[in-house]
């Protein structure tokens, strides 16, 4: 299986997703469309991972539109897609649903609560990394998967085809450090009231990698 990853900033890498590809014997290729505008084709993609980034799906950029064209092709072909943050927003927008300002800006560690049992054996609550101020509307094709105290629409699942999460399960400790070092000023105005130092002081929950494995296994089994 060829897993193609769309990465949108140097400081938001695949983290535990790469660990999963290695453990499952998948081939992983990373693309940086924001740099050169180059994307994989649908034919050379068995699974697509769309990571986060500082841009918005509403930005009028050709490569962002080309990403959605690829997502549309893969959804039509029933090939699995996983999106984190901006990536989840891209899936929702591809399906015709709005991406807009969130009622609250969330940056830092905070719990999310599971809202669906479509995917077996997920924890009822998880401590995850938030890094966003926009949100998606839940597609009619999908089930609400996660919510938080500040935001209902934290995640969705289109059964066996796509998962979109507004937050991040995938960062390992090095990924968190890269996000904070390169984008620590983004914590200003967050309702979570965490400083960059607070974020770095919180250990990455080991169960988050386990959850990444369960989510990606669900999409590919």
Predicted segment positions?
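Short, solvent-exposed loop/turn segments at secondary-structure boundaries
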Residues: 59-63, 103, 123
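Short gly/ser/thr-rich secondary-structure transition/capping motifs
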Residues: 27-35, 111, 128, 145-148
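Nucleotide donor/acceptor-binding cores
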Residues: 1, 46, 126
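N-terminal beta1-alpha1 ligand-phosphate binding loop
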Residues: 3-21, 31-34
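Flexible gly/pro-rich beta->alpha loop and the following alpha-helix that scaffold active-site loops
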Residues: 22-82
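Catalytic nucleophile loop
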Residues: 74-98
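Amide-donor transfer/coupling interface in amidating biosynthetic enzymes
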Residues: 5, 100, 115-221
């Amino acid at each position: 299986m060829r897993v193609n990853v769309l990465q949108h900033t140097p400081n938001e890498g695949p983290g535990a997703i790469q660990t999963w590809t290695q453990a499952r014997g998948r081939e992983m290729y990373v693309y940086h469309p924001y740099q050169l505008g180059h994307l994989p084709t649908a034919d050379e993609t068995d699974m697509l991972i769309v990571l986060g980034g500082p841009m918005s799906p509403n930005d009028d950029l050709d490569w962002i539109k080309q990403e959605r064209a690829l997502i549309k092709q893969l959804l039509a072909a029933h090939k699995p897609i996983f999106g984190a943050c901006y990536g989840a927003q891209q899936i929702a927008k591809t399906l015709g649903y709005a991406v807009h300002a969130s009622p609250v800006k969330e940056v830092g560690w905070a719990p999310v609560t599971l809202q669906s049992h479509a995917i077996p054996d997920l924890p009822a609550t998880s401590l995850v990394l938030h890094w966003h101020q926009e949100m998606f509307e839940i597609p009619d094709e999908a089930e609400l998967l996660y919510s938080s105290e500040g935001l209902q629409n934290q995640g969705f699942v289109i059964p066996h085809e796509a998962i979109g999460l507004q937050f991040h399960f995938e960062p390992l400790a090095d990924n968190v450090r890269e996000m904070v070092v390169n984008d620590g000023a983004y914590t200003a105005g967050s309702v979570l009231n965490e400083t960059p130092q607070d974020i770095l002081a919180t250990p990455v929950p080991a169960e988050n990698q386990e959850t990444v494995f369960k989510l990606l296994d669900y999409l590919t089994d």
